[in-house]
A protein has these predicted regions:
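Conserved catalytic cores of very large enzyme subunits
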Residues: 2-377, 398, 404-557, 564
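Hydrophobic/aromatic-rich, well-ordered segments within soluble, folded domains that form packed cores
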Residues: 178, 182, 376-398, 555-579, ...
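Intrinsic, low-complexity terminal and presequence regions
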Residues: 540-557, 563, 567-612
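Local sequence-structure signature of Cys/Sec-based thiol-disulfide redox active-site neighborhoods
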Residues: 607-637
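Thiol-based oxidoreductase modules, predominantly thioredoxin-like and allied folds used
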Residues: 618, 637-649
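Short amphipathic alpha-helix with an adjacent loop that forms part of the alpha/beta core around
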Residues: 650-655, 689-692
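Structural micro-motif
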Residues: 652-664
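Non-catalytic, surface beta->alpha helical segment in thiol-disulfide oxidoreductase systems
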Residues: 665-700
Length: 700
């Protein structure tokens, strides 16, 4: 008897996961190989089969199975991403769902931090993608003011928030995918509004009166993110987005030093460009309130690359395989005919999904979403694309990649055509549609893998190794090491998307200091119109010696294995967790070099070495540095403490790459060059202390 095609081979499914034989095991790099991952894999296969067999019609299901399009998040019977009103949580508390406990509005910062962690964790189980809060620092500041909290108390609260969000509490042994936007300075639309604490407005105190407390929140958050975990590993969540406005203060404030040191070292923040883009800082709070008077108007999704503005988001994402359309098209007219057909299928699938999950919402399947959101009216239906660079190469009438003007012009025409089509769908279906530069963590690999098997002569991003397509309309990953040459091209393309577009400045290793990072961030904001961008240095982590600059397969100090971290389609994960296609992309990348003259940055004169015999190189936020200081002090060993942040040239001159590092000046002949002994990491300091307790002198 023939097997029903909708039946799942459970043995193949489980064995494929356990033996890592199925590429989907690494489809999402945030999911750890674990029993939770196995459960998610099994349930995901069942749910995906349900979508394709019982919800979508045959035309939609076949288009996905053939890899003409990719229906994202088939493994979950939920919407895609959502932004939530932190103001609403502060006013109403956490709860209000029948049969579940309810917490009153928070009266203290510690309580609010706990409620935010629980809220995001709950919502992450009702959605497939990122959960976001806007104006994090603005809304939290009044709680600091109301209780007169010390900086130590504020930092403790923020620390519990960050650690709570990074606990793998979500299905699949994942941490909740979370994003926050930080205003840095009090937004104009909130300045004169009375603060809310304990669910009540407090007359006589406005958000504009809380800038000092905002600074405390921002300092605490950045210090926690800079410190990383006990092994020096950067925190994955929340992904912070900072607003760069025309009145951004670029002076050498304490918080600026911390912000751009975090950027230089870990590449953690996203930056929203409010200087030259057509966005406004208040968009994250006002999008849900706008009247839809013109059905053809395409709105931009606010709230950051992954995040969403208050009470907005996306019900689902469908990505179109652009290289295949170009490869099969006879000419340009045929290309647009094929593209329109795929867009029609994508738009219809999103309408079906919206109707289906709206029915489930009304039936109570997402109780907390129903309580805090109510409906999906302000959530987009999202259509994205992958491989426009390879589409241009495969198109017989272009036959060039995106580094050529002919291909760039064609790409702009295609994106504008897609925008017009989205306006048609808004009129037809009455829903919001947007055009996204899809992150495509697994989709770029899936499309290329299918196409290489099916079409012998189709061109992917690489001629060797595992195939992949370039994300959205990005340039070839090995195009140039000149960041501004890449920006010049991308600026004209990325501004045509209405969501999910970002420029990643991939850097081989951390920038030299916070000033260099600040100069580069400012140069981009003031000279380009693209809405979001990041600086993305590669770094490694050794469990013994902590943070290491750049890509280090083995620790240069202890010889042990490391985790190499880079940004995969928007967030940092160990490269060994990436799927084969993205891992190949990482190998192929040409990283950008930063020309200091181009960004108007000049390094300060080298700091001369002082004459003390023993120096301890530390950073201001590293817990292992404090441990090293304690070891030396308790052993009655005299030393001079040198902050790496304040003496970057001196530290670079001595070749120090890890904090803490203990440097001992060796005895040499009077006219000889200085020589030094290095004791690297906390283990090196331990060795020095233990050896010198015995009075034996140097051990290296």
């Amino acid at each position: 008897m023939d097997q029903n095609p909708n039946m799942i081979d459970y043995k193949k499914l489980v064995d494929g996961y356990l033996g890592l034989a199925d590429w989907r095991v690494k489809e999402n790099s945030t999911v750890t190989y674990s029993i939770g991952g196995l459960i998610l894999s099994n349930s995901g296969a069942v749910t995906a089969n349900y979508w394709l067999s019982h919800v979508y019609d045959k035309e939609i299901a076949d288009a996905h199975r053939r890899a003409d399009i990719h229906l994202h998040d088939l493994s979950m019977l939920t919407g895609y991403c959502a932004g939530w009103s932190l103001k609403q949580l502060i006013q109403e508390g956490l709860g209000g769902v029948p049969g579940k406990i309810t917490s009153s509005p928070a009266s203290h910062l510690s309580t609010l931090c706990n409620q935010m962690v629980n809220f995001i964790g709950i919502m992450q189980n009702e959605w497939a993608g990122a959960q976001a809060f806007s104006s994090f620092d603005t809304y939290l500041a009044p709680f600091v003011k109301a209780d007169g909290l010390s900086y130590k108390e504020v930092k403790q609260c923020i620390q519990s928030f960050v650690y709570g969000l990074n606990t793998p509490s979500r299905w699949g042994t994942q941490a909740p995918f979370s994003n926050i936007t930080l205003d840095w300075t009090v937004p104009e639309d909130l300045k004169d509004m009375p603060i809310i604490v304990g669910g009540k407005k407090i007359e006589g105190i406005t958000y504009g009166d809380c800038q000092r407390e905002m600074d405390m929140i921002n300092k605490a958050f950045i210090e926690v993110m800079l410190e990383g975990d006990a092994n020096g590993r950067g925190f994955q969540y929340p992904i912070p987005t900072y607003s760069i406005t025309k009145n951004f203060d670029w002076s050498e404030t304490e918080n600026n030093k911390l912000l751009f040191e975090m950027t230089a070292k870990y590449g953690t923040p996203y930056f929203s460009n409010y200087i030259n883009s057509d966005m406004e800082p208040s968009d994250v709070r006002s999008m849900c309130c706008r009247l839809r008077l013109d059905l053809r108007e395409l709105r931009k999704k606010s709230g950051g690359y992954f995040g969403s503005g208050e009470s907005t988001g996306s019900v689902g994402v469908v990505t179109i395989n652009m290289p295949r359309i170009a490869y099969l098209a006879i000419d340009e007219q045929d290309f647009y005919t094929r593209l329109d057909k795929m867009m029609d299928i994508a738009a219809r699938s999103l309408k079906i999904k919206r109707n289906f999950i709206t029915q489930l919402l009304d039936e109570g399947l997402y109780p907390y979403t129903k309580r805090y959101l109510g409906n999906f009216d302000n959530h987009f239906s999202t259509i994205g694309l992958v491989g426009m660079n390879e589409a241009c190469i495969n198109a017989k009438w272009i036959d060039k990649d995106l580094t050529h003007e002919k291909a760039q012009k064609f790409t702009k025409d295609v994106l504008n055509h897609m925008r017009e089509r989205l306006s048609d769908y808004q009129e037809l279906y009455g829903d919001l549609y947007n055009l996204e530069a899809t992150p495509a963590e697994s989709t770029s690999y899936r499309f290329a893998k299918h196409d290489r098997e099916r079409y012998m002569n189709i061109i992917s991003a690489n001629d060797y190794g595992d195939p992949y397509y370039t994300n959205s309309s990005h340039l070839p990953v090995d195009f140039t090491d000149d960041i501004f040459a890449a920006l010049d091209v991308q600026d004209g393309l990325q501004t045509l998307y209405t969501s999910g577009t970002v420029f990643h400045a991939y850097l081989g290793e951390r920038l030299s200091d916070w000033r260099q990072a600040a100069h580069l961030v400012r140069k981009i904001a003031e000279n380009y119109s693209l809405p979001y961008y990041t600086l993305s240095p590669t770094y490694s982590v050794c469990k013994e010696d902590g943070y290491l600059e750049g890509e280090c397969g083995l620790c240069p100090y202890c010889g042990g294995p490391t985790e190499v971290y880079s940004r995969i389609t928007g967030y940092y994960r160990p490269v060994q967790n990436w799927n084969d296609g993205k891992a190949q992309e990482f190998k192929d990348r040409t990283e950008y070099k930063v020309d200091n003259d181009a960004i108007g940055y000049s390094q300060e004169e080298p700091v001369e070495a002082v004459e003390s015999v023993l120096k301890l190189i530390v950073t201001k936020t590293c817990p292992k540095c404090k441990e090293a200081e304690k070891l030396l002090t308790e052993a009655n060993i005299e030393y001079e403490k040198v902050y790496a942040e304040d003496n970057p040239e001196f530290v670079r001159k001595l070749g120090v790459k890890i904090a803490p590092t203990l440097i001992e000046k060796a005895y040499v002949e009077p006219d000889a060059d200085d020589d030094y002994f290095y004791y690297t990491g906390i283990n090196g300091v331990h060795r020095y202390v233990n050896y010198n307790k015995k009075g034996n002198g140097n051990d290296e």
